[in-house]
Amino acid sequence: LAMAHLGISRVIELNLDTDQLGDYSEVSLRSKYIDIIRDVQPYLVITFDPDSYLYEDNEDHRKVAVSMAEAMWTSGFDKHPGSASGGVKPFLPVARWYFGREVAKPTHQLDVTSYIDKLTAATSLHRTMLINMARQWWLKGRTAGVSLDEFFQSVNSDVRFFAEMIVRRSREKN
């Protein structure tokens, strides 16, 4: 839903459970990405920054970053068949764009100011993620002896204000 809101017409679903990729084989994930790269033959791949490993606390993001970075060069060699058996048709994307919460060494920044409303609306569509983030804040508040009950209830009923807060906060960092 969020991808369609941004104008992305095709999403390839790997049917992997969120927040559980830490238990998934990096080699198996890389193999899936090799297959996708060879099948789709993208000019550009946009993914998590593998060099921001130390700055990312989400194991899913780290696993995707490393596996995809490896797949983007191994897809060009016949020694890495992916899941295919027999004849392998190597393919390499021309460009790679990385992103992250805190990138190790930024090389480019895009000004998305004119898209901020669209970005906020798309972020709002990630209801489960936003509720999980709010739950983490609520739990930390409870540990610190601070009640965030009203905040958590507000996010549960309508995530839009929280999405806007996150988008605006990320813009302030840059």
Give the positions of each predicted feature.
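Short, solvent-exposed amphipathic alpha-helices that sit
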Residues: 1-6, 67, 71
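A conserved beta-strand->alpha-helix junction
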Residues: 3-17
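Metal-dependent de-N-acetylase/amidase catalytic core
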Residues: 19, 23, 27-174
